[in-house]
């Protein structure tokens, strides 16, 4: 039973690290989007947006599986996911104002 608990703890730790890495990736892509790099083309920005969204989606999908990590670590990951989501929503609202106004 002790081995099973150790395995579960290690798996939870690895899952938390994976989620954190996905969020880091998402923040990296979002930073490029919000910096409005003058040399970045429209296709490039759409690719960064897609990758940031994918990173957030993957992290958000994995978060409910975090059962064995302490509440502080879980809370930190949830807050980071929320901040990334807000940044992406803000970018979308600014980059596609017509889409937002039309409710798409």
Regions found by a protein language model. Name each.
Residues 43-54, 73-82:
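Short, charged, amphipathic alpha-helical segments
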Residues 1-38:
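Short terminal alpha-helical segments
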Residues 35-43, 67-71:
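Charged, low-complexity interaction regions
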Residues 61-77:
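Short, solvent-exposed, charged loop/turn and helix-capping segments
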Residues 73-104:
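Amphipathic alpha-helical binding modules
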């Amino acid at each position: 039973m002790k081995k099973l608990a150790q395995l579960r703890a290690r798996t939870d730790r690895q899952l938390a690290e994976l989620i954190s890495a996905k969020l880091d990736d998402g923040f990296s892509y979002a930073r490029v989007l919000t910096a409005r790099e003058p040399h970045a083309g429209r296709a490039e920005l759409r690719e960064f947006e897609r990758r940031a969204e994918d990173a957030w989606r993957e992290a958000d999908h994995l978060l409910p599986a975090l059962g064995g990590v302490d509440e502080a670590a879980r809370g930190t990951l949830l807050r980071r996911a929320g901040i990334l989501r807000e940044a992406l929503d803000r970018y979308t609202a600014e980059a596609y104002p017509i889409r937002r106004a039309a409710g798409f």
